C-alpha cells in the first residue's frame, strides 16, 4: 500500500514540476536577458567558469569556458572542459526561441548559443567536484569517489581521451580515508589546496612538494576538529593562512594554518540547526561570509563577532548545497539545492518595506528565483567576466547559462510586474 501511495505522490510531484516549468518557460522573455539550456550526455555534479574569455573580432559573441565533470551510470567518466558562446550586449537575443529538436533555448538573432565540449580527460569514477588553480588555471583538482584527490594539467592531456579508459592524473593527493566534496585552492599561496571529506577531516597539500613514487603527494597537514562529515572548505580570499570549514556536526569552524594545534580551530560556531553543506567568503568585505544548510537557510556571518548570526535568508524549501557570492557586487549572493531553485539575494534590501502581496513571494532581500531546473541543482558558478551570468547544472543532465533581466537588478520598475519566479501577477 505504501508503495502505491509513494508512486502516486511521485506522479503528482512530477506533474507539479512540469506545470511550473511550463509557466517558467512562458515567462522567460520577461525575466531573462539570456537563457541557454543544454542537455549534457551525462549529468555534471560540478560547474566552474574558467577565468579567460576570448572576444573574436567582428563577431557578436564572446567565448567562455567551463570546467565540468560526468556522473555516468557505469560507463567511463571524464573531466570536461566546455566552451560557451555568449552573445554581446548588442546581439539580439530572443528568449521565445526554443529549439525543441535540440532541446535547447537560445536564439540571438540568427546565432544560436553554442555550447561545445572541447576536452575530455579520463577520470576514476564520477567527478564530485573540480576546481582550477587561480595562479595557473590549466591545473585542475578533482574529488573522486575514492579517498584520492587528483590533479590534472589539462594541457598535458589529449583533448580526446584514451579509449582504454586509463586515468592518468599528474598528481595523486593522499591523506583522506573517504570521499568528499569540499575543495579550495588558496588564492594567495600558489599550489596550496584544501579538501574536505566524509572521514571528518580536512587535508592540506602543497602541490609544489616533490611527489613520491606513482606521482603521490602526502598531505602536509590534516585538521581534525569536526566530529562528523566535513561538507565544504574554503580559503579566506585575502588572508593566506585563514580558512573556514562546515560539517554535518552543524558547525562552522575558522582555522589558521599558523597555529600548531590541528585539532582545535581558532573559532567554532553552532551555525545551523541541521547539517551545514557549504560556505563562501565575500570577495569585497574581508569579515563577511555566508553558510548554507540542510535547515533550508543561508546564514550571514561577521568574523569579528561569530557569536551573533547577522541574518538568515529564508525562502528555500529544502536543503541548500551551494552558496556563492557574486564576483561583481558586494551585496549579492546566490544559493541553490534540492528544491530545484537557485535564489539570488541582495543584502542591501534586508529590512525594506514590502506590500503584503510582495511578502507572499518572499522576503525583500530575495531578488530573483531561477526556476528553470526540474531536478536538484548540483552546482553553479558566477561568470567572472560577464556580470549577472550564471551557469547551473542539475541532476537530470541539464546545464543552463542564464542572466536575469537587467531591470530586476537595476531597481527600475519593469512594465507589468512579474513575481520573482515568473508565476505572473
Swiss-Prot record:
Q: Name one GO cellular component term.
A: CAF-1 complex
Output the Gene3D superfamilies linked to this UniProt entry: YVTN repeat-like/Quinoprotein amine dehydrogenase (2.130.10.10)
Q: Where are the WD repeats?
A: 32-125, 126-175, 176-223, 225-270, 271-314, 315-371, 372-404
Q: Which residues carry this modification: N-acetylalanine?
A: 2
* Renumbered residue ranges of the record's region Interaction with HAT1: 361-406
Q: Where in the cell is it found?
A: Nucleus; Chromosome, Telomere
Q: Per the annotation, which location comes first and is thus the protein's main one?
A: nucleus
Which biological processes are named by the entry's GO terms? chromatin remodeling; DNA repair; DNA replication; DNA replication-dependent chromatin assembly; regulation of DNA-templated transcription
Q: Which GO terms describe its molecular function?
A: histone binding
Pfam families assigned: CAF1C_H4-bd, WD40
Keyword terms of this UniProt record: Acetylation, Cell cycle, Chaperone, Chromatin regulator, Chromosome, DNA damage, DNA repair, DNA replication, Nucleus, Repeat, Repressor, Telomere, Transcription, Transcription regulation, WD repeat
Q: Which PANTHER family match?
A: WD40 REPEAT FAMILY (PTHR22850)
**What is this protein's function per UniProt?**
Core histone-binding subunit that may target chromatin assembly factors, chromatin remodeling factors and histone deacetylases to their histone substrates in a manner that is regulated by nucleosomal DNA. Component of several complexes which regulate chromatin metabolism.
Subunit composition and interactions:
Binds directly to histone H4, probably via helix 1 of the histone fold, a region that is not accessible when histone H4 is in chromatin. Interacts with CHAF1A, HDAC1, HDAC2, HDAC3 and HIRA. May also interact with HAT1.
User: Family, per the entry?
Assistant: Belongs to the WD repeat RBAP46/RBAP48/MSI1 family.
Q: Can you name this protein?
A: Histone-binding protein RBBP4
Q: In which organism is this protein found?
A: Gallus gallus (Chicken)
